[in-house]
Amino acid sequence: MAVDVYRGTSGIQLPVEVSAEIWQKIQDASVVMGLARRVPLSGAGVTYQEILEDPTPQFVGETDRKPVSNPTFAKKTLKGHKIAVVSTYSDEFRRDLPGLFNALVSRLPGALARTFDMAALHGVGAPAADFDDLSGATTASILNTTAGSVDAYAGFLAALGAVPTLNAWALSAQGEVAALSNRDVNGGAILNPNVLTNGSIGSILGRPVFRSGNAYLAGDAAAATLGIAGDWSKAVWGQVEGVSIDISDNPVYDADGDLITAGWQDNMIAVRAEIHVGFIADDSQFVRLLGAEPAQVA
């Protein structure tokens, strides 16, 4: 049967072990991995205890009975979940055409990172259990109703008011445009490009701004997500081992069990790449920044 990648496509032979280089590129491409707190993660997962409320002491008089007040707790389980993809190639493609290795290193990390970010930030494709996402975080509008106005500035202030410990903004290109095309109440720029730290593109209200297309999620009218902001110390991620890369000439099937290629019999190979990652967060410490869909160019 016809397959997607052969000598007429483009590429190069792939060494089996490219995990370290690919993993570094995944982290570089993921805004969540860059901002959230990274912790060690075993295959069995890790349970974190969270103190929700401290005991409440009171003044008491002489001989009066002391009040009883206990802390309240919650727990979250950080567990590794698999993100995987299988691509098929002809033996002739692998043998004759250079570039597959470079293409894998340059493109696969971004694809894996985007899958993780979209799940963590927006709940897109997220596992049903033991994996948090920020889709339910409170919202603030940075809708740019009038260019050069303070519309968006009010939204950024509202986000900071909702999460006073907010320590970073993750903005899509659309969110960056909203910030750049508005002003604060003194007529100054909202996005200050002069404060550049750790890969940020500037600062808003003294907090660093990081650009990522993964922070964008399409929505209706003025309800597109243009960015995510919050206290990123309240978000935790971990990885189990590194990136697993395998090459096989075994048959490959789709999700319905239908044969895609017979592998060795068809002179085809399959490249499987997977990572195991987990994410937990307190979504009450984050704000989704909403605005208009970008205008379509005719």
Question: Where are these predicted regions, by residue range?
Answer:
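Assembly/oligomerization interface modules of large self-assembling protein complexes
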Residues: A2-I83, D283-F286
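Short, Φ-rich (hydrophobic/aromatic) sequence segments
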Residues: V18-V32, L100-L108, L112, F116, ...
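Short helix/loop capping segments that flank catalytic or ligand/cofactor-binding pockets
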Residues: T56-F59, L97-P98, A178-S181, G188, ...
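Structural signal for terminal/edge beta-strands and the immediately following C-terminal loop/tail
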Residues: I280, S284-A298
